[in-house]
Amino acid sequence: AEIGWTDVTKLAADRRTLNLSDQLYRSIGSISANVAEGFSRGSRRDRARFYEYAHGSAREARDWYYKGRHVLDAEVVDHRLRLYSEIVRLLLTMIPEQRGASLSEPGPVYEVDPLNLFNNVPLS
């Protein structure tokens, strides 16, 4: 959630995106919280359930960033869309490992270079 703090602050400053900023902050905070809670669960089934919640929150965060594109800098939005797409991809690997099934995300395919997501992070 730390990376989104300045983004949420910028969105909250614009009356048109005040509600969007709250939804974005909740969704990005929910990702790590659900991964942490899932990791602490004793059964694979419980772990998978919390990873699925995190997956939904990551998709939601990505959607809120897209909707906030008119207020946030284009470079920031591009980075966050790629970052949350990578998180979705990682969770789609983690969930089947716990469930024993396969999942995949349908297009559009976002090009993501995971090594560059944390270098020169743009801030709003």
Regions found by a protein language model. Name each.
Residues A1-S124:
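Short, C-terminally biased terminal segments at protein or domain edges
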